[in-house]
């Protein structure tokens, strides 16, 4: 190989690699965004990759990464002086927090907030001038907000149950909140009653160095029969430790366990909901609950018709488990928010039917144009090609009126029946390919007694497989990604295909970027997998179609 050829190939491969990287960036961004939690999405500094979860062995704790990066001058002195201002506000620091380390982080947090709120002209002055301008802004409320950003505390609030008749009851309301659940692992966790902004809750001080889990249990009397129990809710504040909260329920002599854990991600108050299987699971409503699966009869289980036993278990996560929880969290949320598999079934049905009808109708019509002799063939072929010149927007309203008059509105019929009549473009592609097939094969088959349909089925179709594969791929992508058709013809959410279902999902979650990207990735993967495995047929089909005729 000559030096010129080496340089030529090097440049060619470099351009191909660069192009691949450039075109892969949007997909990489979608994939990384799909596994981010909300605070990463709305952070003031953009970061392509998700932040690594940090499992904690003890809690409560300080998150020293929240204000790890600061911008602005005088970073060596001002954070400590802001910490002194925080002390001067009289903010009540919890006794179980390290005061020195906490105020140090709060000083950094106040510095960051002042850097973003004060005019930049002030920051060109001395440290004393900056401190003087910032002092009126350092209030107890401001300090409290900064403290909430760096302090992580696992807390349990009230537990509520609801019956099928919508009777709501707070469990253990006659007891202090820290005594409503019995501590089964005192060597791991200590329960303390605390209050914050008028809300009473149980603070969990834990240490997983001896055991990797803690367990809290409680037996409660219900105001209704346990058979009517619909859902259980726990108001809690996670501590961003990425641990796993599991629930098991005993009632009516049976034990029920959660099918998956509630992940202790983020650090704002949230509601964890568990519910037994029921009609809601197959409905189109947003599923904000975790299913409780029936484990069958259990020895010693509560059997009183108006009594229930709850067992909450918090399990410490390793770094690998925490990463798995983070990678799957948003995807579980997507599957909970929409009837994803119902949408997938509809899309798969449409894909299979449309591909089958398109391949059959287009190949049969192309065969008649390419191999059969009949009066007006060329005129009909030109007329068919002329239909490609008509913009689809022109025929959109007439199509809608026709389908509505036929009673097919709000059914799947308009989304697949039209494919039984072929596609002008695909017919043209197949005709060009068929015209390149030697007529000797057809003549030999006729001598053997084959009619035109048998020739079509046994001779022509096997020879045009690459082109059929290309058409199948195009049809798959068009049907899988079809948005306009369902938008026009479908009103019943139960009939939504995946593309339109994800649009409705994006509206429901107010275009939350992480959830939207997770849903989009789930929709994109089948197309990518199909093209990856079928690219040889796709390239072969398009190439041969282009050179035949």
In which residue ranges do the predicted regions lie?
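A structural signal for multi-pass alpha-helical bundles of membrane permease subunits
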Residues: 2-97, 103-105, 109, 117-121, ...
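Membrane-topology segments of multi-pass transport proteins
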Residues: 1-5, 38-336
